[in-house]
Regions:
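Thiol-/selenol-based redox modules, centered on thioredoxin-like
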Residues: 105-114
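The canonical Cys-X-X-Cys-His
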Residues: 19-28, 109
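Electrostatic cytochrome c docking/interface patches
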Residues: 2-18, 29
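Short cysteine/histidine-rich zinc-coordinating motifs and their immediately flanking basic loops
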Residues: 33-39
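Axial heme c-ligation environment in periplasmic c-type cytochrome domains
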Residues: 36, 51-72, 77-105
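Short microdomains enriched in Cys/His and/or Lys/Arg
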Residues: 43-53
Length: 116
């Protein structure tokens, strides 16, 4: 089930939290690391980061089609593999092993990403 963030996010807190994400993600368009660039990521259609090789789990979910809106990102940041499995309709694994446990942290990171 999708759930929109229950809390209003704080972009400044999200920026601090993003430092953990920066180990695998860039905020610069066209600069991919282990994970895709997160520039303009909120509202982006799945699988559209140029030059990034998505994992098979993400590709399987993309075949069903989705947009990385706030509801998707909330669920994905909580449990990436579970969200991809839900969309694909079969067990999938995300390349992103990191999970956020606190709803407040999720809302803060999404709010920060909306500014990028």
């Amino acid at each position: 089930l999708s759930a929109a963030p229950a809390l209003a996010g704080d972009a400044a807190k999200g920026e601090k939290l993003f430092k953990r994400c920066a180990a695998c993600h860039s905020l610069e368009a066209g600069v991919n690391k282990v994970g895709p660039s997160l520039a303009d990521s909120v509202g982006r259609e799945c699988g559209t980061v140029e030059g990034y090789k998505y994992g098979s789990g993400y590709q399987a979910a993309c075949e069903k089609g989705f947009v990385a809106d706030e509801a998707f990102l909330t669920d994905y940041l909580r449990d990436p593999s579970a969200k991809l499995s839900e969309i694909a309709g079969s067990k999938q694994r995300s390349k992103m092993a990191f999970k956020l446990k606190k709803d407040e942290d999720i809302a803060d990171i999404i709010e920060f990403l909306k500014t990028q």
